[in-house]
Amino acid sequence: MRARLFLGLMAAAPAAAMALAVAPAAAADPGVTVYPGMEIRQGSTLCTLGFVDPEARAAFTAGHCRGDGPVTDKAGHVIGAMALFDDNTPDGATVTGDHQIADWGAIALADDVQINPVLPGGRALVIDEAQAVSRPGQQVCHFGVVTGESCGTVAAVNNGWFTMGNGVVSQKGDSGGPVYTLTPDGRAAIVGLFNSTWGGAPTAVSWQSTGQRIREAVATQPASSNTGIEAAISFTSESVDAGVNPPA
C-alpha cells in the first residue's frame, strides 16, 4: 500500500496542489511524535526539523541535512524517509545577494508517527502567505536544536534567501530549523528554513521560494524516470502525473 502525501506547503499557491506518493517508509516506533524544531538525524547528519503537515504526513528540513538511511529522531526511532531534496549551497565560495540558494528536503513520514505542528515553546507553526519576508527590519525568530529560540530582524532580502541579525543566533545542528514571524493571535507563521551562516550572518531560504522550487522540481521530472516516487500536480483545470526520481 502506498501513502499519499498532500504537501500543505502548496497551500501558498491556491491554483495548484501537489502530492507525493511514495512507498511507505519503515514503520516508526509507536509513540514517536514529530514536531517542528525537533532534532532529526539521517546517517551521521544532525539537523532540525523545520515544518510538519499533519494532513499531508509530510515534513521539511534543509536539503543539505540528507544522509544515509531513514530519518530518525535523536533516540534513533525512525520517523520517515527523505523523498525529495534540492541543495545548491555553495561550499567555500563567496556568496553575493543575486546568488540563488536552494536548500530543502521533503520527508515522507512513517505511518505510525504522531504529528504535532507545535514548536517546543508552545506556538503552533502555520503557513500564512501574508507573513512572507519582504523587507529588512522585519521581525523574525528562529528555532534550532542547539541554540533554541532566538529572535531578531531581517538584515537583507536576497534571491530566494535572507540574512538575519540583531539577536538571531545559530550553531551547527540548527540547519533546517524553522524561521518564523509571530502573529497577533499567538501563533508562528513560517517564513523560511535555516540554511547556514554567510559573512557572519545567520541565513535562511525563503519558504515561498522553497515552495516554488519544489513545484518546479516535481514538474520537470520525466514520467519514464519513475522509480518509486510518484508526483501528481493538480491544477484547477488539469491534472498532470509525473515520475520523480528518489535522491541518490
Summary of predicted features, one role per range:
Residues 1-28:
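Secretory targeting and sorting signals
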Residues 12-19, 51, 106, 196, ...:
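Hydrophobic alpha-helical membrane segments, chiefly transmembrane helices and signal peptide h-regions
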Residues 21-33, 39, 92:
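Cross-kingdom Sec-pathway N-terminal secretion signals
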Residues 32-45, 59, 116-123, 146-235:
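Active-site region of chymotrypsin-like
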Residues 94, 119-130, 165-166, 235, ...:
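Second-shell loop/turn segments in exported
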